[in-house]
Protein backbone atom coordinates (compact mmCIF):
# COMPACT_ATOMS: atom_id res chain seq x y z
CA UNK A 1 0.00 0.00 0.00
CA UNK A 2 2.83 2.42 0.85
CA UNK A 3 4.31 2.11 -2.64
CA UNK A 4 1.00 3.20 -4.17
CA UNK A 5 1.05 6.40 -2.13
CA UNK A 6 4.62 6.96 -3.29
CA UNK A 7 3.69 6.40 -6.96
CA UNK A 8 0.83 8.87 -6.56
CA UNK A 9 3.32 11.67 -5.85
CA UNK A 10 5.21 11.06 -9.14
CA UNK A 11 8.59 10.68 -7.37
CA UNK A 12 10.58 11.22 -10.58
CA UNK A 13 9.03 14.65 -11.04
CA UNK A 14 9.52 15.50 -7.36
CA UNK A 15 13.19 14.48 -7.49
CA UNK A 16 13.85 16.44 -10.68
CA UNK A 17 12.30 19.56 -9.21
CA UNK A 18 14.27 19.18 -5.99
CA UNK A 19 17.48 19.15 -8.03
CA UNK A 20 16.51 22.50 -9.52
CA UNK A 21 15.53 23.84 -6.07
CA UNK A 22 18.95 22.83 -4.78
CA UNK A 23 20.63 24.49 -7.75
CA UNK A 24 18.75 27.73 -7.16
CA UNK A 25 19.55 27.69 -3.44
CA UNK A 26 23.25 26.99 -3.88
CA UNK A 27 23.80 29.57 -6.62
CA UNK A 28 22.20 32.22 -4.39
CA UNK A 29 24.18 31.08 -1.33
CA UNK A 30 27.52 31.74 -3.05
CA UNK A 31 29.31 29.37 -0.72
CA UNK A 32 27.72 30.65 2.51
CA UNK A 33 25.36 27.70 2.92
CA UNK A 34 22.89 27.42 5.79
CA UNK A 35 22.33 23.68 5.89
CA UNK A 36 19.34 23.90 8.24
CA UNK A 37 17.66 26.38 5.89
CA UNK A 38 18.54 24.20 2.90
CA UNK A 39 17.05 21.03 4.43
CA UNK A 40 13.91 22.85 5.57
CA UNK A 41 13.42 24.37 2.12
CA UNK A 42 13.99 21.04 0.36
CA UNK A 43 11.56 19.11 2.57
CA UNK A 44 8.87 21.80 2.35
CA UNK A 45 9.23 22.14 -1.41
CA UNK A 46 9.17 18.36 -1.89
CA UNK A 47 5.92 18.04 0.04
CA UNK A 48 4.22 20.89 -1.84
CA UNK A 49 5.31 19.47 -5.21
CA UNK A 50 4.15 16.00 -4.15
CA UNK A 51 0.77 17.47 -3.20
CA UNK A 52 0.47 19.08 -6.63
CA UNK A 53 1.32 15.79 -8.34
CA UNK A 54 -1.32 13.92 -6.33
CA UNK A 55 -3.93 16.54 -7.23
CA UNK A 56 -2.87 16.30 -10.88
CA UNK A 57 -3.37 12.54 -10.74
CA UNK A 58 -6.85 13.08 -9.29
CA UNK A 59 -7.82 15.59 -11.98
CA UNK A 60 -6.35 13.57 -14.87
CA UNK A 61 -7.61 10.13 -13.85
CA UNK A 62 -10.19 9.99 -16.68
CA UNK A 63 -7.71 10.84 -19.44
CA UNK A 64 -5.00 8.71 -17.83
CA UNK A 65 -7.31 5.72 -18.24
CA UNK A 66 -7.31 6.01 -22.05
CA UNK A 67 -3.66 6.93 -22.61
CA UNK A 68 -1.17 4.11 -23.12
CA UNK A 69 1.55 5.92 -21.17
CA UNK A 70 -0.61 6.53 -18.10
CA UNK A 71 -3.17 3.73 -18.01
CA UNK A 72 -1.31 1.93 -15.22
CA UNK A 73 -1.28 4.87 -12.81
CA UNK A 74 -2.53 4.23 -9.29
CA UNK A 75 -5.90 5.99 -9.53
CA UNK A 76 -6.68 4.28 -12.84
CA UNK A 77 -6.16 0.83 -11.33
CA UNK A 78 -9.29 0.25 -9.24
CA UNK A 79 -8.81 -0.70 -5.62
CA UNK A 80 -5.21 0.45 -5.15
CA UNK A 81 -6.09 3.84 -3.62
CA UNK A 82 -9.56 5.37 -3.40
CA UNK A 83 -10.37 8.92 -4.48
CA UNK A 84 -11.22 10.26 -1.01
CA UNK A 85 -7.95 8.86 0.33
CA UNK A 86 -6.05 10.63 -2.45
CA UNK A 87 -7.70 13.97 -1.73
CA UNK A 88 -6.93 13.66 1.99
CA UNK A 89 -3.35 12.66 1.16
CA UNK A 90 -2.87 15.73 -1.07
CA UNK A 91 -4.23 18.05 1.61
CA UNK A 92 -1.95 16.59 4.29
CA UNK A 93 1.10 16.86 2.02
CA UNK A 94 0.26 20.47 1.26
CA UNK A 95 -0.29 21.41 4.91
CA UNK A 96 3.00 19.90 6.04
CA UNK A 97 4.79 21.34 3.01
CA UNK A 98 3.78 24.90 3.80
CA UNK A 99 4.44 24.26 7.49
CA UNK A 100 8.05 23.32 6.72
CA UNK A 101 8.41 26.34 4.43
CA UNK A 102 7.18 28.56 7.25
CA UNK A 103 10.17 27.36 9.28
CA UNK A 104 12.43 29.11 6.76
CA UNK A 105 10.98 32.39 8.12
CA UNK A 106 10.85 33.54 4.52
CA UNK A 107 7.36 34.57 3.44
CA UNK A 108 8.52 34.87 -0.16
CA UNK A 109 9.13 31.11 -0.47
CA UNK A 110 5.61 30.44 0.82
CA UNK A 111 4.08 32.86 -1.69
CA UNK A 112 6.08 31.41 -4.58
CA UNK A 113 5.17 27.85 -3.61
CA UNK A 114 1.49 28.78 -3.37
CA UNK A 115 1.60 30.49 -6.77
CA UNK A 116 3.33 27.49 -8.34
CA UNK A 117 0.84 25.05 -6.82
CA UNK A 118 -2.14 27.16 -7.92
CA UNK A 119 -0.88 27.50 -11.50
CA UNK A 120 -0.07 23.79 -11.82
CA UNK A 121 -3.28 22.47 -10.27
CA UNK A 122 -5.86 25.20 -10.80
CA UNK A 123 -4.84 26.84 -14.07
CA UNK A 124 -2.93 24.13 -15.94
CA UNK A 125 -4.35 20.77 -14.80
CA UNK A 126 -7.93 21.77 -14.05
CA UNK A 127 -8.51 24.25 -16.86
CA UNK A 128 -6.03 24.85 -19.70
CA UNK A 129 -4.66 21.35 -20.36
CA UNK A 130 -7.94 20.19 -21.91
CA UNK A 131 -8.73 23.46 -23.67
CA UNK A 132 -5.66 25.15 -25.12
CA UNK A 133 -2.52 24.31 -27.06
CA UNK A 134 -0.81 27.01 -25.00
CA UNK A 135 -1.38 25.20 -21.71
CA UNK A 136 2.27 24.13 -21.50
CA UNK A 137 3.35 27.78 -21.59
CA UNK A 138 1.29 28.45 -18.49
CA UNK A 139 2.40 25.16 -16.96
CA UNK A 140 6.01 26.07 -17.63
CA UNK A 141 5.74 28.86 -15.05
CA UNK A 142 4.86 26.39 -12.30
CA UNK A 143 7.59 24.06 -13.54
CA UNK A 144 10.11 26.89 -13.21
CA UNK A 145 9.13 27.78 -9.65
CA UNK A 146 11.31 25.25 -7.72
CA UNK A 147 14.67 26.85 -8.61
CA UNK A 148 13.20 30.28 -7.90
CA UNK A 149 11.94 29.06 -4.51
CA UNK A 150 15.40 27.70 -3.71
CA UNK A 151 17.08 30.91 -4.84
CA UNK A 152 14.74 33.16 -2.85
CA UNK A 153 15.06 30.97 0.25
CA UNK A 154 18.80 31.70 0.26
CA UNK A 155 18.75 35.28 -1.04
CA UNK A 156 15.60 36.32 0.86
CA UNK A 157 14.56 38.49 -2.08
CA UNK A 158 13.24 38.23 -5.62
CA UNK A 159 15.91 39.94 -7.68
CA UNK A 160 17.24 39.77 -11.23
CA UNK A 161 18.83 36.39 -10.52
CA UNK A 162 15.49 34.91 -9.48
CA UNK A 163 13.84 36.38 -12.57
CA UNK A 164 16.51 34.92 -14.84
CA UNK A 165 16.07 31.46 -13.28
CA UNK A 166 12.32 31.74 -13.87
CA UNK A 167 12.95 32.63 -17.52
CA UNK A 168 15.62 29.94 -18.07
CA UNK A 169 13.59 27.09 -16.62
CA UNK A 170 10.35 28.26 -18.28
CA UNK A 171 12.06 28.32 -21.68
CA UNK A 172 13.44 24.81 -21.15
CA UNK A 173 9.96 23.44 -20.41
CA UNK A 174 8.55 24.22 -23.87
CA UNK A 175 10.79 22.08 -26.14
CA UNK A 176 10.83 19.40 -23.44
CA UNK A 177 7.02 19.25 -23.37
CA UNK A 178 6.71 19.47 -27.15
CA UNK A 179 9.01 16.48 -27.56
CA UNK A 180 6.68 14.46 -25.32
CA UNK A 181 3.66 15.69 -27.30
CA UNK A 182 5.22 14.46 -30.56
CA UNK A 183 6.42 11.21 -29.04
CA UNK A 184 2.97 10.47 -27.57
CA UNK A 185 0.95 12.01 -30.40
CA UNK A 186 -1.60 9.19 -30.64
CA UNK A 187 -2.06 9.08 -26.87
CA UNK A 188 -3.05 12.74 -26.78
CA UNK A 189 -5.35 12.29 -29.77
CA UNK A 190 -7.21 9.45 -28.04
CA UNK A 191 -7.57 11.55 -24.88
CA UNK A 192 -8.67 14.63 -26.88
CA UNK A 193 -5.90 16.76 -25.41
CA UNK A 194 -5.21 19.77 -27.70
CA UNK A 195 -1.43 19.75 -28.05
CA UNK A 196 0.61 21.91 -30.39
CA UNK A 197 1.56 19.02 -32.73
CA UNK A 198 -2.08 17.93 -33.05
CA UNK A 199 -3.49 21.39 -33.76
CA UNK A 200 -0.59 23.07 -35.59
CA UNK A 201 1.30 20.08 -36.99
CA UNK A 202 4.65 18.51 -36.18
CA UNK A 203 6.66 20.78 -38.50
CA UNK A 204 5.27 23.91 -36.86
CA UNK A 205 6.06 22.38 -33.47
CA UNK A 206 9.67 21.84 -34.54
CA UNK A 207 9.91 25.56 -35.34
CA UNK A 208 8.51 26.35 -31.93
CA UNK A 209 11.04 24.07 -30.24
CA UNK A 210 14.03 25.62 -32.02
CA UNK A 211 12.91 29.15 -31.13
CA UNK A 212 12.63 28.28 -27.45
CA UNK A 213 15.97 26.45 -27.43
CA UNK A 214 17.59 29.59 -28.87
CA UNK A 215 15.84 31.64 -26.17
CA UNK A 216 17.14 29.21 -23.55
CA UNK A 217 20.70 29.58 -24.88
CA UNK A 218 20.47 33.39 -24.77
CA UNK A 219 19.08 33.32 -21.23
CA UNK A 220 21.91 31.11 -19.92
CA UNK A 221 24.44 33.46 -21.53
CA UNK A 222 22.81 36.48 -19.88
CA UNK A 223 22.83 34.71 -16.52
CA UNK A 224 26.62 34.56 -16.68
CA UNK A 225 27.04 38.05 -18.16
CA UNK A 226 24.99 39.42 -15.24
CA UNK A 227 27.53 37.86 -12.86
CA UNK A 228 25.54 34.99 -11.36
CA UNK A 229 27.68 32.18 -12.76
CA UNK A 230 31.25 31.70 -13.95
CA UNK A 231 32.42 31.64 -17.54
CA UNK A 232 33.46 28.02 -17.08
CA UNK A 233 29.80 27.31 -16.31
CA UNK A 234 28.87 29.17 -19.49
CA UNK A 235 31.33 27.25 -21.66
CA UNK A 236 30.14 23.86 -20.43
CA UNK A 237 26.41 24.60 -20.64
CA UNK A 238 26.84 26.32 -24.04
CA UNK A 239 28.47 23.23 -25.53
CA UNK A 240 25.53 21.15 -24.36
CA UNK A 241 23.03 23.76 -25.52
CA UNK A 242 24.53 23.80 -29.01
CA UNK A 243 24.22 20.01 -29.09
CA UNK A 244 20.52 20.42 -28.23
CA UNK A 245 20.09 23.11 -30.89
CA UNK A 246 21.85 20.95 -33.48
CA UNK A 247 19.48 18.10 -32.71
CA UNK A 248 16.57 20.53 -33.00
CA UNK A 249 17.67 21.60 -36.49
CA UNK A 250 18.25 17.96 -37.40
CA UNK A 251 14.51 17.47 -36.93
CA UNK A 252 13.88 19.36 -40.19
CA UNK A 253 15.64 16.56 -42.06
CA UNK A 254 13.42 13.90 -40.50
CA UNK A 255 10.46 12.84 -42.62
CA UNK A 256 9.08 9.52 -41.42
CA UNK A 257 10.74 9.10 -38.03
CA UNK A 258 9.46 12.03 -35.99
CA UNK A 259 8.75 9.89 -32.94
CA UNK A 260 12.34 8.60 -32.85
CA UNK A 261 13.67 12.15 -33.18
CA UNK A 262 11.27 13.34 -30.47
CA UNK A 263 12.50 10.62 -28.13
CA UNK A 264 16.10 11.76 -28.65
CA UNK A 265 15.05 15.37 -28.04
CA UNK A 266 13.24 14.35 -24.88
CA UNK A 267 16.24 12.45 -23.50
CA UNK A 268 18.58 15.26 -24.48
CA UNK A 269 16.38 17.81 -22.71
CA UNK A 270 16.69 15.72 -19.54
CA UNK A 271 20.48 15.63 -19.91
CA UNK A 272 20.49 19.41 -20.37
CA UNK A 273 18.40 20.16 -17.28
CA UNK A 274 20.26 17.69 -15.05
CA UNK A 275 23.57 19.18 -16.20
CA UNK A 276 22.27 22.70 -15.64
CA UNK A 277 21.20 21.86 -12.10
CA UNK A 278 24.54 20.22 -11.30
CA UNK A 279 26.47 23.16 -12.73
CA UNK A 280 24.37 25.65 -10.75
CA UNK A 281 24.96 23.63 -7.59
CA UNK A 282 28.72 23.31 -8.07
CA UNK A 283 29.57 26.56 -9.85
CA UNK A 284 30.62 28.63 -6.84
CA UNK A 285 32.45 25.69 -5.24
CA UNK A 286 34.43 24.59 -8.29
CA UNK A 287 34.55 27.48 -10.73
CA UNK A 288 34.60 30.72 -8.74
CA UNK A 289 37.50 33.08 -9.43
CA UNK A 290 38.69 32.67 -5.84
CA UNK A 291 38.90 28.90 -6.11
CA UNK A 292 40.58 29.03 -9.52
CA UNK A 293 43.28 31.37 -8.16
CA UNK A 294 43.86 29.09 -5.19
Curated annotation (Swiss-Prot):
<feature type="transmembrane region" description="Helical">
    <location>
        <begin position="107"/>
        <end position="127"/>
    </location>
</feature>
<keyword id="KW-0997">Cell inner membrane</keyword>
<feature type="transmembrane region" description="Helical">
    <location>
        <begin position="163"/>
        <end position="183"/>
    </location>
</feature>
<dbReference type="InterPro" id="IPR000537">
    <property type="entry name" value="UbiA_prenyltransferase"/>
</dbReference>
<keyword id="KW-0808">Transferase</keyword>
<protein>
    <recommendedName>
        <fullName>Protoheme IX farnesyltransferase</fullName>
        <ecNumber>2.5.1.141</ecNumber>
    </recommendedName>
</protein>
<feature type="transmembrane region" description="Helical">
    <location>
        <begin position="8"/>
        <end position="28"/>
    </location>
</feature>
<feature type="transmembrane region" description="Helical">
    <location>
        <begin position="81"/>
        <end position="101"/>
    </location>
</feature>
<keyword id="KW-0350">Heme biosynthesis</keyword>
<comment type="function">
    <text>Converts heme B (protoheme IX) to heme O by substitution of the vinyl group on carbon 2 of heme B porphyrin ring with a hydroxyethyl farnesyl side group.</text>
</comment>
<dbReference type="GO" id="GO:0005886">
    <property type="term" value="C:plasma membrane"/>
</dbReference>
<dbReference type="GO" id="GO:0048034">
    <property type="term" value="P:heme O biosynthetic process"/>
</dbReference>
<feature type="transmembrane region" description="Helical">
    <location>
        <begin position="133"/>
        <end position="153"/>
    </location>
</feature>
<keyword id="KW-0472">Membrane</keyword>
<keyword id="KW-0812">Transmembrane</keyword>
<feature type="transmembrane region" description="Helical">
    <location>
        <begin position="35"/>
        <end position="55"/>
    </location>
</feature>
<keyword id="KW-1003">Cell membrane</keyword>
<comment type="pathway">
    <text>Porphyrin-containing compound metabolism; heme O biosynthesis; heme O from protoheme: step 1/1.</text>
</comment>
<comment type="similarity">
    <text>Belongs to the UbiA prenyltransferase family. Protoheme IX farnesyltransferase subfamily.</text>
</comment>
<feature type="transmembrane region" description="Helical">
    <location>
        <begin position="230"/>
        <end position="252"/>
    </location>
</feature>
<feature type="transmembrane region" description="Helical">
    <location>
        <begin position="209"/>
        <end position="226"/>
    </location>
</feature>
<keyword id="KW-1133">Transmembrane helix</keyword>
<dbReference type="InterPro" id="IPR006369">
    <property type="entry name" value="Protohaem_IX_farnesylTrfase"/>
</dbReference>
<dbReference type="GO" id="GO:0008495">
    <property type="term" value="F:protoheme IX farnesyltransferase activity"/>
</dbReference>
<dbReference type="Pfam" id="PF01040">
    <property type="entry name" value="UbiA"/>
</dbReference>
<dbReference type="InterPro" id="IPR044878">
    <property type="entry name" value="UbiA_sf"/>
</dbReference>
<feature type="transmembrane region" description="Helical">
    <location>
        <begin position="266"/>
        <end position="286"/>
    </location>
</feature>
Amino acid sequence: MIKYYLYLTKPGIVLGNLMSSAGGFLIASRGAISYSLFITMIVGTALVIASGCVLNNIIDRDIDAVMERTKHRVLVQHGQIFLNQSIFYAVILSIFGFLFLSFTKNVLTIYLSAIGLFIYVGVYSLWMKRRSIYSIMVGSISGAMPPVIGYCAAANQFDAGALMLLIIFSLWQIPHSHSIAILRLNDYKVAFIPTFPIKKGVESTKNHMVVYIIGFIIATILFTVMGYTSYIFLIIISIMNLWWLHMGFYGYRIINHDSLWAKKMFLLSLIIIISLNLLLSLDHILFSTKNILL
